[in-house]
């Protein structure tokens, strides 16, 4: 191996941008979820809408396979956009909680919007 390879690798690793925290808060998700209902969107707004809907879809899918009592029960006829709307409605009433991770705010929002029968 040439002598310069370890130096290049060390420099590359040292200059790499630090990873963002896994989940720093819910504010960004709220911003992204404003776009699915918007008519004309820019490319960036389309990307944000897709990020929102994809995160919610993955979150709901993950919650469906967790053992134990379900924290929420979304009807099968509910669309992803309706789920995003429910999240935005909840976030509008609970702006003080948006410093919490996205998964926490989503679980609380869906627990209120889509409670399970008792």
Residues of each region from the PLM?
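Sec/Tat signal peptide C-region and signal peptidase I cleavage site
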Residues: 17-23
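Bacterial N-terminal signal peptides
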Residues: 6-15
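Short, low-complexity, intrinsically disordered N-terminal segments
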Residues: 16-17, 87
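Positively charged n-region of N-terminal signal peptides that target proteins for export
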Residues: 1-4
């Amino acid at each position: 191996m040439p002598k310069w390879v370890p130096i290049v690798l060390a420099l590359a690793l040292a200059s790499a941008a630090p990873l963002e925290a896994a989940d720093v808060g819910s504010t960004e998700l709220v911003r992204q979820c404003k776009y699915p209902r918007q008519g004309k969107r820019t490319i960036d707004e389309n990307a944000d809408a897709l990020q929102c809907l994809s995160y919610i879809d993955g979150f709901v899918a993950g919650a469906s396979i967790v053992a134990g009592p379900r924290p929420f029960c979304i009807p099968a006829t509910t669309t992803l956009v309706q789920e995003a709307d429910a999240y935005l409605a909840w976030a509008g009433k609970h702006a003080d909680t948006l410093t919490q991770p996205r998964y926490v705010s989503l679980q609380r929002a869906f627990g209120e919007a889509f409670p399970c029968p008792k």
